[in-house]
A protein has these predicted regions:
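N-terminal beta1-alpha1-beta2 module of alpha/beta enzyme domains
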Residues: 1-69, 167-170
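Active-site mouth loops of central-metabolism enzymes
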Residues: 9, 13-27, 77-79, 167-177, ...
Length: 398
């Protein structure tokens, strides 16, 4: 299956580098952002969730209305919507978008964050509830007959759903780095999301996920989604200078209370963030170009690991993860809209997903960051032969 790319849709011009306090939705910005992702052939966009943030369903429906190809990943916390209601809402969005809906589950990694919306289950209970939730969704989409449910977390009788997904079901994504996340995602998810860790640790996590899938008796395995924050410039030297400017801005914003994480924030409770901070304590740079000071600058809040370097360096770094089994790569920078356009448009960002068969036939690939569908090792060889003539022409804003 080809490698696919994911971005994240932002509803206004506020960024981590230049935050706009209490920024409201800018409808025209949101529509322009979504159209750019569609035009530059991103495959998916994640619509995030936070207790204090905009409603992802409304934002997702807006994205669906102004795009034609982009798949819309709705981030969903089970405590926010009863599963039978979510089944209909997702299927409705799927019909409105002609089969482009995806759901990404967040079990909840912070007791304090969950409590803000009335959820007082502990972490283990939240994962148990998530397991029920996914099973209910699948049954609601597939069952031809009304059905009952009676478990610790949900109880209902004779639920009948007439709102069906376009393709019979909707892809389910799960993320996390805990044993419960591996078990539930490995056994039930279509996609499993990971944050960018060094290759060794990423391989260990993928092996855990695959082992859980096998233990559950699956004949398939979840697709692996890995997230990075690329910082790219024409040369490695320029990229590192840009990276340090980015880090200085993140640190300054946090110190002045403008960052997404206050300076006095306690250590994170979720395992994924704890893992990132532990890796950061071992050194700044891992493998080819994986950079961790952005993790400590944000207290590992969400996806925060950067890939730093020239287009060649960053593309080779991502291909290392593709070789491990990652076939969904999330890329978003720190200057949200500009970076999304640069990744999609500029030759300087040139990750290629051009079909092997067409390359072998002599067709010229589009010069496009998101053109990326070689088989794993063939990608590496053909990247250079296809793009060597134009590498010297690459340029990117620093």
């Amino acid at each position: 299956m080809p490698t696919e790319f994911i971005s994240l849709t932002f509803p206004n011009a506020s960024t981590e580098l230049n935050p706009i306090p209490n920024a409201a939705i800018d409808p025209e910005f949101l529509k322009r952002y979504a159209r750019n992702l569609d035009d530059y052939e991103y495959n998916y966009t994640l619509v995030p969730y936070d207790s204090s943030y905009f409603d992802p369903w409304t934002v997702g429906a807006t994205i669906a209305a102004v795009t034609t190809k982009l798949k819309i990943i709705i981030a969903l916390r089970p405590n926010t919507l009863f599963p039978t209601v979510a089944a209909k809402a997702l299927a409705t969005l799927d019909q409105l978008s002609s089969g482009r809906a995806v759901v990404h589950f967040i079990a909840g990694g912070s007791d304090a964050e969950q409590a803000k919306e009335g959820d007082f289950l502990n972490k283990q209970e939240r994962y148990e509830r998530l397991e029920d939730y996914i099973k209910i969704l699948r049954r609601a989409w597939e069952s031809a007959e009304p059905f009952d449910w009676d478990s610790k977390y949900y109880k209902f009788t004779q639920f009948s759903n007439r709102v069906r997904p376009v393709n019979g079901t909707i892809p389910v994504s799960v993320g996390g780095s805990s044993d419960d996340a591996y078990r539930i995602g490995g056994s039930l998810a279509d996609i499993f999301g990971l944050w960018g860790e060094p290759l060794k640790e990423t391989k260990e996590q993928i092996d855990r996920i695959y082992a859980e899938a096998e233990k559950a008796g699956r004949t398939d395995r979840p697709r692996i989604w890995v997230t990075f924050r690329p910082i790219i410039a024409e040369t490695d030297e320029l990229a590192w200078a840009k990276a340090h400017r980015t880090l200085n801005a993140l640190q300054s914003n946090r110190a002045t209370g403008q960052g997404k994480v206050p300076a006095n924030t306690p250590p994170p409770q979720n395992v994924g963030s704890q893992r990132l901070l532990e890796i950061a304590s071992r050194g700044e740079v891992h493998d080819r170009a994986l950079w961790y000071p952005t993790v400590t600058a944000t207290n590992a809040r969400g996806a925060s690991t950067a890939l730093v370097g020239s287009p060649e360096t960053v593309s080779e770094s991502i291909l290392d993860y593709v070789d491990l089994g990652a076939d969904l790569i999330s890329i978003r920078g720190y200057d949200n809209l500009s970076d999304a356009i640069d990744y999609g448009r500029n030759e300087s960002s040139y990750l290629v997903r051009y079909p092997t068969a067409q390359c072998c036939a002599g067709h010229k690939p589009r010069s496009h960051f998101l053109q990326f569908s070689f088989t794993q090792r063939q990608r590496r060889c053909q990247l250079w032969s296809l793009y060597a003539p134009s590498i010297l022409a690459f340029s990117i804003g620093s």
